[in-house]
Every structure is written in structure tokens, then in C-alpha cells.
Amino acid sequence: TATTGLPSAFISAEIRDLPIKQGGTGVIKVQTIPGVTLGGILVDHPLNFFAMEDGTQVALQGVHALLPPGIYPLRLDAILPDGSKQSYEQFILIVSGNYGSEIIPLNDPSTIDPTTTEPELQQIISIVSNTTSNLYWNSIFETPAAYPDCYTSRYGTYRTYRVTNTEIQIPGFHTGLDFCGGDGLPIMAPAAGQVVFAGALTVRGNVTVIDHGWGVYSGFWHQSAIQVQVGEMVEQYQVIGLVGGTGRVTGAHLHWELWVNGIQVDPLDWLIQTYP
């Protein structure tokens, strides 16, 4: 926590859990004098600040799993009531997430064709890029799966796809957390929120996306059944769908993805500590 060396608009500034790992979530908490509007950047991502009940302003920002480890800027910008601007900048360390690698057998090469995957990814990005000021969750996130401690693939692993004995290298990583479990098992909402997408996509299969507020979104891929509708408010633990094998899969499982201000982060972090 910094309290000295700050411009006069700032009372204190805290960056939680330094250094931040690849795939981690940066938490920036700032106290200012009254009437200040906050902005800034972490790495190269614009920060969105929201007021907590005690008056502290907080921003949450995901760090990309493929961002090279190193030193990156954090800048805080304060706009005063008279329109003047004060800034505070420091450098923070991003460290390796120590993610492994895996080879994925694939039956249908079309599901990794960029002409298929890129438009679908952009559709998801457009959904999760809307930042709502409502905060719907008020406790630690809970596992969405029936088998909470059984994973078939962790977040962050580098992936190579194998099609009939030919390995196809597509630059990328596993963007979520895959849980064990077969067709028809229930999927629970890890935290409260509002359903902003519910439908079928080519790669992700039957998809539900929940807005938890403050730029935090959960995505659930490959479902056999969707049991919620767009616009519906869901509570933590509510059953929102059933595990399936739709889309680009090697078998039925739950893929849970967590986005924080436009970046996919490691969902396990959100299961072991409370944000913000």
C-alpha cells in the first residue's frame, strides 16, 4: 500500500497480491479526496474503477496467460472536480504461471479453422466487454461442477491439436478450467449474476454466459442442456444447465471460463480467495 509519494488527489493506493502471475487477477484499491474520478492502465488495459461501500474505489484486471513475464506499468489517473488531472505510476512484476502443455486429439479439423473460431471468439469478446456497474456477487466464488476437485484440464496449458496422426500447432492456451463429469450432471452458478447469453455455438457448443458485474463474466461451454434464459437473474448454486459434449470436445465435460475486464483468468484463483 502506497500512502507517501502520491499526488494530492490520492489518499492511498494498494495493489493486491504482488507479483501478479500470468492468468492472474490484479486488484487495485484506491482512496481519493472527494469528487475525484479515477482511471488508469495495468499493462495496456484501461482500468474501470467502482466504489465500494466504504468509499474505496477498486478496479479488477485480468492478466493474459501468454503475456511474457516481466516488468509492466500500472498508472492511476485522477480527474479532479476542476478538470485537472494527476497521475501516479509504478512498475509491477508479472511472473510465470508455470502452465504445462498438452496434445488434444481432434476428429473434426473444421473446429480449429480460424474462419470458424475467430468470429465466434469475437462474439464472446463483444459480450464480455460490457462493464456493468452493478456488483452481483458478495462472497467467494464456488465451484460450478458436481465433482469440485476433479479436473481434466487446467487453465493456461499450451495446446497442440492432433488430427489423424498429424499435429497442428495453433498458438494458444486452455482458456478455462475443465471439470470431470459426464452427460447430464448439473452445472451450478459459481456466483450470482445476470444471464447475458444462452445459445448454441460451433466450437463452444451450448453456451451460457453470466455477468457477475464490475467486468467479471463466467462462461459455461459444451452443455447438453441450457436451463436459463437471457436476462434472467441467477443466484449462487442455482442449476443453470447440464454437462454435455456439444461443440469442440473429446468427451462430455464442463468447461468454465472466467473473464475479468476482457481477459480470461485462472478460475481456480477465484475459488480459493475472495475478490475484490
Indicate residue ranges for each PLM-predicted region.
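Surface-exposed, glycine-biased beta-strand/turn segments
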Residues: 88-204
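Short, well-structured beta-strand-loop connectors
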Residues: 186-196, 227-243
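Short strand-coil-strand connectors
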Residues: 41-45, 79-82, 192, 211-214, ...
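Zn2+-dependent peptidoglycan hydrolase active-site motif and core
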Residues: 189-227, 252-257
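Short polar/acidic secondary-structure junctions
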Residues: 64-66, 184-185, 200-201, 246-248, ...
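Conserved, short, structured surface segments that act as functional micro-motifs
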Residues: 151, 206-212, 216, 232-276
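Short, surface-exposed secondary-structure boundary micro-motifs
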Residues: 31, 182, 200, 238-239, ...
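Cationic-aromatic interfacial patches
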Residues: 2-90
